Curated annotation (Swiss-Prot):
It holds the Pfam family Ribosomal_L26. InterPro entries: Rib_uL2_dom2, Ribosomal_uL24_euk/arc, Ribosomal_uL24_KOW, Translation_prot_SH3-like_sf. Disulfide bonds: none annotated. Keywords: Ribonucleoprotein, Ribosomal protein. It comes from the Eukaryota. GO terms for biological process: cytoplasmic translation; ribosomal large subunit biogenesis. CDD domains: KOW_RPL26. The keyword Iron-sulfur does not apply. This is Large ribosomal subunit protein uL24. Belongs to the universal ribosomal protein uL24 family. Residues 1-33 are annotated as: Disordered. Residues 9-18 have a biased composition (Basic residues).
Amino acid sequence: MKYNPRVTSSRRRNRKPHFTASSSERRVXMSSPLSTDLRQKYNVRSMPIRKDDEXQIVRGTYKGREGKLXQVYRRKXVIHIERLTREKVNGTTVNVGVQPTKVVITKLRLDKDRKSLLERKAKGRAAADKDKGTKFTAVDVMQNVX
């Protein structure tokens, strides 16, 4: 949904910034959702994906495959997962590119910068949850369902 009338949502105008995005902008665009365990633990929904994270593919041909991230290829906007390869016609094996949106992060590689990012995102989310008044309680919803 569009909130700011001064920001365009036109496909035509958004294509150029998308394809000419810098590496730092692509890092944010190449985010993946966290698994339900990590989401409850850190109170964060998604994170920019990085090299030594572990992930599981949730959509596409390779659905269900898990592994450690071998490479985050920002220029092509794909990620390579270890042991996810295919054989070319000439016999060489190549890594298969997967879009980061089709992957769920199951294990994070944490360093001090990433921990601070998690804390910052969780703090913002907690503030938003506090402001949001729940109109109905879980009991009210369940009574209406039955």
